[in-house]
A protein has these predicted regions:
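A compositional/structural signature for long, glycine/proline-rich flexible linkers
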Residues: 1-183
Length: 183
């Protein structure tokens, strides 16, 4: 085989390999975040029975023999939401030491964050919707999600285990669920 033909075949093979690598790379970048978020949402929603409801961390401090939390001094409330079922309300009282609410769309992008220092009062009332489907008479702060599904995370900083009963009561007073009259 002449060297010229071998060089052309080698160049074509390199172009095909590079193009294939770019296509695979882009497919991974475009799809892996959604796959990861779907796994997280399914785990949080317990296979579909707990969409649009909150789950709460009920223990304080490091977890011995279990999966470590990012911050053992944080008591966390989480919710996997599905707005195809309608808007979702999240309301309650903040926590005096530190409180924050973060919302993530279905590709893991964080699209909304607020903490207790940004609120005018110690209570919060948010309605999360898709496509601005909220009754204008609602007095809650309206947040439009860029995707129909996502995840909400509320973090509370707890200084010691002595605060555990109070933070558990704070979590239990929260409302996470569909927007209904009087919710």
């Amino acid at each position: 085989m002449p060297i010229k033909r071998l060089a052309i075949y080698t160049l074509l093979a390199a172009i095909i390999a590079a193009t294939s690598a770019l296509i695979v790379r882009q497919a991974v970048i475009d799809n892996v975040p959604q796959w990861v978020m779907k796994l997280i949402q399914d785990r949080m929603a317990d296979g579909g029975d707990r969409w649009n409801t909150c789950s709460h961390t009920r223990t304080y401090g490091p977890v011995h023999g279990g999966v470590s939390r990012a911050n053992p001094d944080s008591m966390v409330s989480v919710m996997a939401y599905d707005l195809s079922r309608g808007p979702v309300r999240v309301s309650g009282e903040t926590w005096p030491n530190y409180w924050s609410l973060s919302l993530y769309q279905d590709n893991t992008d964080n699209y909304f964050v607020i903490n207790d220092r940004e609120l005018e009062t110690s209570s919060f009332d948010f309605i999360i919707s898709y496509d601005d489907e909220v009754d204008p008479a609602e007095q809650a702060q309206h947040i439009t999600s860029p995707t129909e599904t996502g995840v909400m995370v509320i973090r509370r900083f707890v200084r010691s285990s002595d605060e555990l009963p109070a933070v558990l009561a704070n979590q239990d007073k929260m409302y996470c669920g569909p927007v209904t009259t009087g919710s």
